[in-house]
Amino acid sequence: MKLGPTGERDELIVKEIIRGNFPEFMRRLAPITVAQKGNTLIYNVMPDYLCIGNDQDYVRVPVSGPSAQRIADAFGMLLPTPRMSDQIYEAAKVRLAPKPLSGMANLNIGGKNYTNQQFMASKMSDTDSFNYHNQVIQEQLQGHQPGELVAGHKKDIVLSNDLQPGRLAIHGLHLKGGTPLQPGGISKHEANYKDYSHGVRLVDNNATLNGQNVQMSAILKDPKYAYLVNTDGVLKQVAYKYDGNDKPKTNVPESAVATNTPQTGRGQFLQRLNDYLSKINIG
């Protein structure tokens, strides 16, 4: 399979995440409680968007829809729906104001200056832009502890009944009050597209409904309960497609998330990533 340069970057990121190179605080999931029409569902999510590194030194890493799905499958987890994205924002202890780079007049990324138009035209998907936006977020998070449930700072890669084959669905960058700048899960982008503003929030497949253990993948397919986490009922497609996932894994043991694989710092990973990408001429 020919991946192309940003696909090669995705491959490296997926391998790093699956081997356990992500912060310890990301392994402590945050509960989301939904109580409607006499039913109470409690599901659990990673406290922040997927990142690589350790608790002191990490970088959030946007990837494509299929790559996000590969990571979710490896950990026995799911991607959220737009309603779940809203619920996570509502439950978040830390709600950040969106700071899209595309709204900034002048940017210095990777040691070079860019106007807004130049950035929009050529830098949205660059590794340097991922790191720059990560630094913007870290400045917003000063005074907060890693592991607190945080939301508002990225667009979620989501599952939606509006999702068309080969396309990407995104939802998020919530404003104060909970209204998303990017609503509805509909995207003009192909499934393999990714840029600095996207994030991957993983949802544990294990949940409780009215005190009973359930699987979120089953809830999303249940006509009686899907409304709890999806605005338009039963979710027709509970996974992005990628080579080899005709039967997506949703039952991987919880220990898959609690791996003891040593983490490397953000700086070390970015250096290795940039060294790798320089060989294929992409920043």
Tell where the protein language model's regions lie, with residue ranges.
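Conserved hydrophobic ligand-interaction patch in extracellular adhesion modules
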Residues: 65-143, 202
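Short acidic-hydrophobic catalytic motif
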Residues: 1-56, 60, 171-177, 191-207, ...
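C-terminal, surface-exposed recognition/capping segments
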Residues: 110-253
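Solvent-exposed loop/turn segments at secondary-structure junctions
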Residues: 50-51, 85-87, 164, 207-209
